[in-house]
């Protein structure tokens, strides 16, 4: 090697050595905490939803639709990446690796900006990102890793990589993608207008596209007691961060506006908006203030740490020593319900527990009327979030979803299950107890509404479709929610949505009718009518 080559090689080695010295601390902190998470294996509430979705992918593959929850709903809006990777290894392991990657990416970003001043913030972020695993927000962990990768690529001038990661981020976590869009707008306001807007448009645009193609909607609650502390922290951050830290100050402004938007306008984001501040504000405080205003940092740090730790403690307390987080708790009632619903298929209403593991363990051959996605539950089942729940209103809801059985656990309930439990305890005449053990009481609904009525009867409901037997020409109502992706794979029939969002089948010829939901691009903007053959589409 020549002298110039040796010099360049030595410089490269020195950079690698310096990078290794900087990264070992966040790598160690996040790695140890991730290992503790994997060993302790806490059954937090959000993990129940991830477990269900990974199980669906293992059995159904990449699906657009699921009938096991809510009478039918679209799947991809909640994230593609975790079900895919989690089915190959383990969802917990995938998220743990993502957290370590996030800690290393954050370190690279802030060391490049603040140098050694960032050390405390780097270690802080590694710890806070890792403890968020204990809340079960696994999709969010993947989304944060992709978002930080996009920010690092943007910082290093690799626009193509940044845009690619911004497009991937919503497939990991829509919430993290909207946070990335917020970061992109911050960069644009700071001066990197084109690069920042590219990131913002890519991430937010992909969220909008997924929402358009696989609509779900609904709103996440954002109560005043959650909004005020977050908004006050944003104001305090803006006041305390030195004026020369323009990028950081622009970011705090963007975050404050995001909080206002999420609080004043009903949206799926809702209270999830606080996650960005809880995860990043404290570590960024430390980076910006450590060598300039340590006293302010020492005053604010306890508040920021409490903001990060309190949700983790609350979630762990919910599942602590609860037998109802284990599959064995559900086995007797699942066996009973499988037996009775095999004879004639109905949905089962399972009162939602505080930790929501019923949504993972009950839908094993059983189609439940609700599930664990707060936004969708509020949209489809608003009666459980209103002040009073009357017996007539409840009976109407049971009939709308063709519920034949109601299962009541002895475990602590979610707040959206308490009014329902109180009503059932008042013994409405249409509910008859048919099974009871130490943990469960199952009620049969008197004269339940069938899943299919009219000109066809139900043969079988499947996770992504249903099979009917057409009895005569005419209309049948199927109490499975409508999707534009229905396809008539067998038989002669046309499908249209009902006014209340379910599926109406017009039987054109008696006999077997098989309907399946599969993604087809030309149906994205489709509307009302789906027929088995083109030449039947004009049939009245």
Which role fits each region the language model picked out?
Residues 311-540:
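Extracytoplasmic
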Residues 30, 100-109, 117-155, 159-188, ...:
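Membrane-embedded helix bundles of polyisoprenyl
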Residues 34-115, 119, 124, 128-139, ...:
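Active-site lumenal/periplasmic loops and adjacent helix-entry segments of GT-C-fold
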Residues 292-311:
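Signature aromatic-anchored transmembrane alpha helix within multi-pass, membrane-resident enzymes
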Residues 2-18, 69, 154-162, 188-197, ...:
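Membrane-interface junctions at the ends of membrane-embedded or membrane-associated helices
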Residues 1-35, 539-540:
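Start-transfer (signal-anchor) and selected internal transmembrane alpha helices
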Residues 41-49, 59-63, 143, 164-281, ...:
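Transmembrane catalytic cores of multi-pass membrane glycosyltransferases
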Residues 19-47, 207-210, 306-309:
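Transmembrane signal-anchor helices characteristic of membrane glycosylation enzymes that use polyprenol
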């Amino acid at each position: 090697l020549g002298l110039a080559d040796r010099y360049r090689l030595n410089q490269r080695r020195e950079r690698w050595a310096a990078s290794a010295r900087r990264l070992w601390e966040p790598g160690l902190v996040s790695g140890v905490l991730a290992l503790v998470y994997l060993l302790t294996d806490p059954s937090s509430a959000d993990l129940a939803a991830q477990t269900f979705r990974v199980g669906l992918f293992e059995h159904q593959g990449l699906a657009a639709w699921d009938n096991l929850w809510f009478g039918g709903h679209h799947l991809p809006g909640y994230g593609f990446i975790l079900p895919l990777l989690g089915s190959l290894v383990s969802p917990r392991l995938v998220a743990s690796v993502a957290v370590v990657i996030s800690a290393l990416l954050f370190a690279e970003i802030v060391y490049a900006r603040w140098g050694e001043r960032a050390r405390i913030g780097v270690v802080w972020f590694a710890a806070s990102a890792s403890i968020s695993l204990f809340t079960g927000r696994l999709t969010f962990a993947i989304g944060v890793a992709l978002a930080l990768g996009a920010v690092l690529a943007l910082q290093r001038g690799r626009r193509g990589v940044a845009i690619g990661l911004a497009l991937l981020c919503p497939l990991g976590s829509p919430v993290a993608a909207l946070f990335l869009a917020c970061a992109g707008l911050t960069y644009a306001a700071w001066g990197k207008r084109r690069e920042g807007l590219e990131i913002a448009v890519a991430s937010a645009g992909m969220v909008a596209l997924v929402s358009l193609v696989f609509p779900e909607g609904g709103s996440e609650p954002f109560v005043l007691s959650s909004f005020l502390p977050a908004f006050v922290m944003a104001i305090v951050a803006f006041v305390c961060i030195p004026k020369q830290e323009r990028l950081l100050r622009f970011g705090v402004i963007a975050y404050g506006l995001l909080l206002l938007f999420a609080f004043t306008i009903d949206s799926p984001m809702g209270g999830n908006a606080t996650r960005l501040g809880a995860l990043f504000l404290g570590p960024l405080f430390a980076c910006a203030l450590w060598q300039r205003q340590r006293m302010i940092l020492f005053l604010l740090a306890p508040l920021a740490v409490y903001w990060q730790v309190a949700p983790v403690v609350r979630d762990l307390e919910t599942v602590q020593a609860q037998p109802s987080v284990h599959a064995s708790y559900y086995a007797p009632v699942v066996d009973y319900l499988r037996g009775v619903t095999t004879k004639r298929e109905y949905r089962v209403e399972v009162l939602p527990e505080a930790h929501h593991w019923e949504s993972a363990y009950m839908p094993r051959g059983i189609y439940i009327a609700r599930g664990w996605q707060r936004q969708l539950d509020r949209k489809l089942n608003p009666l459980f979030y209103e002040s009073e729940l009357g017996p007539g209103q409840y009976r109407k809801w049971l009939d709308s979803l063709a519920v034949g059985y109601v299962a009541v656990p002895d475990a602590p309930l979610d707040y959206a299950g308490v009014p329902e439990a109180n009503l059932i305890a008042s013994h409405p005449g249409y509910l008859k107890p048919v099974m009871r053990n130490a943990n469960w009481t199952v009620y049969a609904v008197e004269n339940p509404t069938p899943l299919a009525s009219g000109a066809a009867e139900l043969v079988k409901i499947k996770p992504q479709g249903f099979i009917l037997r057409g009895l005569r020409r005419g209309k049948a109502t199927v109490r499975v929610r409508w999707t534009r992706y229905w396809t008539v794979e067998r038989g002669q029939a046309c499908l249209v949505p009902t006014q209340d969002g379910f599926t109406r089948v017009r039987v054109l010829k008696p006999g077997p009718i098989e309907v399946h939901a599969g993604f087809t691009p030309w149906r994205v903007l489709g509307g009302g009518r789906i027929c088995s053959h083109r030449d039947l589409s004009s049939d009245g």
